[in-house]
């Protein structure tokens, strides 16, 4: 009998136009470039004879499985996603796609984030998922609003300095 696990949380099916284009480009690259290369290498490894002790053959089979798994995921995910390419009617409040500048009330440090879909998060660029605790706390806030965010590192208080939708 297998161990019961709660169902995985569904991620928000929103994405920016840039994120959608990136996922489509990745799917296209996997399907048209990487997969054919791996299939050719797999055929060459299979032609070398005994497959039971053929490390190249085993590696290529595994690699092909990983590519096929990612292709299936991307195909399903792209169908489910909704591209958000317009700014909200209330451009002074924080919604999906917003570029937000925050001030940490405790340290005075200025932080800049963009709220994006879960498929396009990038900590290095300051892109946070709309499903993250900080983004959920930020939604519908306006400039000069002070709010508390319950983050993994503890409770933090922030002030919204600016909201911009120029990137949409």
UniProtKB/Swiss-Prot annotation:
PROSITE patterns: GREAB_1, GREAB_2. One of its GO terms (biological process) is DNA-templated transcription elongation. Necessary for efficient RNA polymerase transcription elongation past template-encoded arresting sites. The arresting sites in DNA have the property of trapping a certain fraction of elongating RNA polymerases that pass through, resulting in locked ternary complexes. Cleavage of the nascent transcript by cleavage factors such as GreA or GreB allows the resumption of elongation from the new 3'terminus. GreB releases sequences of up to 9 nucleotides in length. It holds the Pfam family GreA_GreB_N. The gene is greB. Signal peptide: none annotated. Gene3D superfamilies: Transcription elongation factor, GreA/GreB, C-terminal domain (3.10.50.30), Transcription elongation factor, GreA/GreB, N-terminal domain (1.10.287.180). GO terms for molecular function: DNA binding; RNA polymerase binding. NCBIfam families: greB, PRK01885.1. Keywords: DNA-binding, Transcription, Transcription regulation. The lineage of its organism: Bacteria, Pseudomonadati, Pseudomonadota, Gammaproteobacteria, Lysobacterales. Belongs to the GreA/GreB family. GreB subfamily. The keyword Lipid metabolism does not apply. InterPro entries: GreA/GreB_C_sf (IPR036953), TF_GreA/GreB_CS (IPR018151), Tscrpt_elong_fac_GreA/B (IPR028624), Tscrpt_elong_fac_GreA/B_C (IPR001437), Tscrpt_elong_fac_GreA/B_fam (IPR023459), Tscrpt_elong_fac_GreA/B_N (IPR022691), Tscrpt_elong_fac_GreA/B_N_sf (IPR036805), Tscrpt_elong_fac_GreB (IPR006358). It comes from Xanthomonas axonopodis pv. citri (strain 306). This is Transcription elongation factor GreB.
